[in-house]
């Protein structure tokens, strides 16, 4: 080998110039201080431009303006529940939803504007997309509307919303009661706590469903419970358990709450509840009977018992 750079089909003087350039010449240029300074300047300029561009670009969410997001993917995770992936305007966008808050979803159905609230289950750093896990109910206007969407159809969204915003060290022991898709705000909080080493909050989650196949995000929940067994206690309750089931059976009871969740007299603790309305009503009654404070009609961050 001669060490000459092979050049084909380059016209005129440029070709003649490059024919006399060796690979060694190129290496010398690439290692020269001037070249390194120029390359560094280009990298810095690109980073600066990217930062300025991203900071001036509108955020995906606005609490006062409805925005449309196209459906990118649908993944059926149980007979009546699916994970819907929606596309953000730019590939580098993150949704920017504070931990514990939710979005509003709106649709015009039968001449009426219907609004419901959902907490995305996508991770905080997910770029270019967000995910909603939604159970379709026979009489659920919004859930049936979302289920009817085809890839490319848009969903009208506004946010963030909500009175709960998790910050590290909010409380020492967090007790959670979730039913079905009510897991959504809980999994966001669980992830935020366990994946932040300085946050030493202990968590107990009672998660209720009808059938075993209805347990959502089970692989992730089980992995977190195994990986953080000293800080994350996970207890499943099933209404229709399979043979050999070792978890709770039936509904979440006062006994489950007394045995697993923080004591009502434990000062540095909170109880969070999210699930279908009948379940929430039953849990409020159970908590009241074992001397937890009665939840407010509209929960606030400093409440002992917070209902999403």
Curated annotation (Swiss-Prot):
Keywords linked to the UniProt accession: FAD, Flavoprotein, Membrane, Mitochondrion, Mitochondrion outer membrane, NAD, Oxidoreductase, Transferase, Transmembrane, Transmembrane helix
GO biological process: protein histidyl modification to diphthamide; tRNA wobble base 5-methoxycarbonylmethyl-2-thiouridinylation
EC number(s) on file: 1.6.2.2
Catalysed reaction, written as an equation: 2 Fe(III)-[cytochrome b5] + NADH = 2 Fe(II)-[cytochrome b5] + NAD(+) + H(+); 2 Fe(3+)-[Dph3] + NADH = 2 Fe(2+)-[Dph3] + NAD(+) + H(+)
GO terms assigned for molecular function: cytochrome-b5 reductase activity, acting on NAD(P)H; NADH dehydrogenase activity; transferase activity
Superkingdom of the organism of origin: Eukaryota
InterPro entries registered for this protein in UniProt: CBR-like, Cbr1-like_FAD-bd_dom, FAD-bd_FR_type, Flavoprot_Pyr_Nucl_cyt_Rdtase, FNR_nucleotide-bd, OxRdtase_FAD/NAD-bd, Riboflavin_synthase-like_b-brl
Topology class, membrane: Single-pass membrane protein
Sequence ranges assigned to domain FAD-binding FR-type in this UniProt record: 64-167
PROSITE patterns: FAD_FR (PS51384)
Keyword match Flavoprotein: yes
Keyword Nucleotidyltransferase attributed: no
Main location: mitochondrion
Pathway: Protein modification; peptidyl-diphthamide biosynthesis
Subcellular location: Mitochondrion outer membrane
Function comment: NADH-dependent reductase for DPH3 and cytochrome b5. Required for the first step of diphthamide biosynthesis, a post-translational modification of histidine which occurs in elongation factor 2. DPH1 and DPH2 transfer a 3-amino-3-carboxypropyl (ACP) group from S-adenosyl-L-methionine (SAM) to a histidine residue, the reaction is assisted by a reduction system comprising DPH3 and a NADH-dependent reductase, predominantly MCR1.1.
Subunit structure: Monomer. Component of the 2-(3-amino-3-carboxypropyl)histidine synthase complex composed of DPH1, DPH2, DPH3 and a NADH-dependent reductase, predominantly MCR1.1.
PANTHER family registered for this protein in UniProt: NADH-CYTOCHROME B5 REDUCTASE, NADH-CYTOCHROME B5 REDUCTASE-LIKE
Record's protein name: NADH-cytochrome b5 reductase 1
Organism: Laccaria bicolor (strain S238N-H82 / ATCC MYA-4686) (Bicoloured deceiver)
Gene this chain is encoded by: MCR1.1
């Amino acid at each position: 080998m001669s060490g000459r750079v092979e050049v084909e089909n380059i016209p005129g003087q440029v070709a003649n110039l490059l024919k006399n350039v060796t690979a060694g010449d190129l290496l010398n240029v690439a290692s020269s201080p001037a070249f390194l300074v120029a390359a560094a300047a280009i990298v810095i300029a690109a980073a600066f431009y990217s930062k300025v561009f991203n900071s001036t670009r509108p955020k995906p969410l606005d609490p006062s303006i409805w925005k449309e997001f196209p459906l990118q993917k649908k993944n059926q995770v149980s007979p009546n529940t699916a994970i819907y992936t929606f596309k953000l305007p730019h590939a580098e966008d993150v949704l920017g939803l504070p931990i514990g808050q939710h979005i509003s979803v709106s649709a015009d159905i039968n001449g009426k504007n219907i609004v419901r609230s959902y907490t995305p289950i996508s991770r905080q750093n997910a770029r270019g997309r967000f995910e909603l896990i939604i159970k379709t109910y026979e009489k659920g206007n919004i859930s049936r509307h979302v289920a009817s969407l085809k890839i490319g159809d848009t969903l009208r969204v506004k946010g963030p919303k909500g009175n709960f915003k998790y910050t590290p060290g909010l409380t020492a022991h967090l007790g959670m009661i979730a039913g079905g898709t009510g897991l959504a705000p809980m999994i966001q909080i669980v992830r935020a706590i366990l994946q932040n080493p300085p946050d030493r909050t202990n968590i107990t989650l009672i998660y209720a469903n009808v059938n075993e196949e209805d347990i959502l995000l089970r692989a992730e929940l089980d992995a977190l419970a195994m990986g953080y067994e000293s800080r994350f206690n996970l207890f499943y309750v099933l209404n229709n358990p399979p043979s050999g089931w070792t978890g709770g059976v039936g509904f979440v009871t006062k006994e489950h709450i007394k045995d697993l969740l923080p004591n009502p007299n434990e000062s540095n603790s909170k109880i969070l509840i999210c699930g279908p309305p009948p379940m929430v009503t039953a849990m409020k009654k159970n908590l009241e009977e074992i001397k937890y404070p009665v939840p407010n009609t509209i929960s606030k961050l400093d409440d002992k018992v917070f209902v999403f």
